Amino acid sequence: VSEESKGEKAAFEIKSLYHGNLRNLNVRVNAGECVVVQDTDNCALRDFLLLLREEKPRSGQILVGGRAVKNVRDRRIAIIQELPVETMIFQSMSYLDNLCFNMDHRFKKVWFSKGIRKSIVSEYGALLGEDVFYKRIGDLTTRQKYDLVYTRILLQNPGVVFCVQPFKKADVSIRSHIWELLERFLKKGIAVVILAVNLADSLALADRLIRIQDGSVQEIYNKEDFVKLPINTPWL
């Protein structure tokens, strides 16, 4: 971990973690910080995601805001999957139901309270567009679908959000919009961890790059050191 991060508040920490291909993994991410984690040999990313989604570590700790994560469904952690407009939107549900899907830990009556739902439409209508709340999911544009997924996570209000290769298959205009959506998390103090095999587009927002090889942290680069990355670094 870089020296400058030690005095700051940790939003997310992994301490001495062993699980699957992960060996003595130590990672710290500060509130409002964007970190790219690159799996250089493509053997750790799957185990890392399984750990966040459904499995407990063999040993070691995972902490959010200094408190241990004991339940894999802990809403303090959010995951934006690879190709989220295909994998994270429920076609059979309304736009508003999709938007509110991760909010029940904050508002227990979100599914039944017209007042809560009306206030969400009022507050986010200007940001998302008033018309989207009345559209069928299949009629949304790609940009509107990205807005839906990322705003759902914003409403969840996690301490950290993990984004799996967020720019994959996105055209140029959508990539720039994804940057804007990620910046919303950062401005709110939410830590962003981009999980990547290749680095195309990912470093534009990053404060640090953590490279993992053989399941352990191999190198850490601060933003000012990105120019020192090896010439054989996989970018595309």
Model-predicted regions and their roles:
Residues 189-195:
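Conserved H-loop
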Residues 175-188:
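Helical segment within the ABC ATPase nucleotide-binding domain
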Residues 164-168, 173:
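Walker B catalytic motif
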Residues 30-34, 39-107:
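ABC ATPase nucleotide-binding domain signature region
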